[in-house]
Regions:
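Short alpha-helical transmembrane interface motifs in multi-pass membrane proteins
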Residues: 14, 38-41, 76-80, 87-92, ...
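Aromatic- and glycine-rich beta-strand/loop motifs that create alpha-glucan
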Residues: 2-47
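Hydrophobic alpha-helical transmembrane segments of membrane proteins
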Residues: 66-97, 159-173, 177
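Alpha-helical transmembrane segments and their short interhelical loops
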Residues: 117, 122-179
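Short helix-capping/hinge motifs at transmembrane helix termini and TM-loop junctions
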Residues: 57-66, 88, 143-151, 179
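Transmembrane helix boundary and interhelical loop/hinge segments in multi-pass membrane proteins
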Residues: 89-115, 125-128
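Hydrophobic alpha-helical transmembrane segments of multi-pass membrane transport/permease proteins
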Residues: 37-63, 75-87
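Hydrophobic/aromatic residues in alpha-helical transmembrane segments
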Residues: 52-57, 94, 138, 170-171
Length: 179
């Protein structure tokens, strides 16, 4: 019996520890590269959508709308449009990643990898958060040329952008698995 066990013993038994950091990083990088390959569709398109909303709403409402909490309406509108794109793209990235994997049949490649469910979920969530934060940064840069944006606390902006995108990307994973 010992001879059989030695004959079929795996020679290079790889031990990952509690977390498979290499697999986690690889999946995260795969998800980030998935949206960076089509940057016009994933980064520029949400920016153009936000700009169109900004222009259409500012033209439709115009100067008829007074100030909101002491700020001009367009200054009040711009952060809301940025937040809208952050949560929308976080949800879209994670749910479409799962759905595309299910439809194309390549989700089995991820499921066969030595990754736990938490590692797969966290890598997908963080990739969606990365996409959302990139969209937020690009939108802030472009909107700052059009609208006077006022920042009161950068730490709050970073924390709430990350948490909002993380929550919506988690919901996107649930919807992607359920659909």
């Amino acid at each position: 019996m010992v001879e059989i066990e030695n004959k079929y013993k795996i020679i290079n038994d790889k031990k990952f520890g509690y977390v498979n950091w290499i697999g986690f990083w690889t999946l995260y990088k795969k998800e980030v590269l998935r949206f960076l390959i089509v940057v016009i569709q994933t980064i520029i398109s949400p920016l153009v959508t936000s700009l169109l909303f900004l222009f259409v709403l500012s033209l439709a409402i115009g100067n008829e709308r007074g100030e909101v909490l002491g700020f001009p309406f367009i200054t009040f509108l711009a952060p809301g449009l940025i937040a809208m794109q952050v949560i929308q793209q976080a949800f879209s990235h994670s749910s479409s990643s799962i759905m595309i994997g299910k439809i194309q049949g390549n989700i089995v490649d991820i499921l066969y990898a030595p990754l736990t469910a938490a590692e797969i979920t966290l890598a997908t969530n963080l990739a969606a958060c990365t996409r959302s934060i990139i969209i937020a940064l690009v939108s802030i840069i472009v909107f700052s040329f059009i609208v006077e944006l006022k920042f009161h606390n950068f730490l709050y902006i970073i924390v709430f952008t990350f948490l909002g995108s993380f929550i919506l990307s988690s919901i996107g994973i649930i919807v992607g698995l359920w659909a």
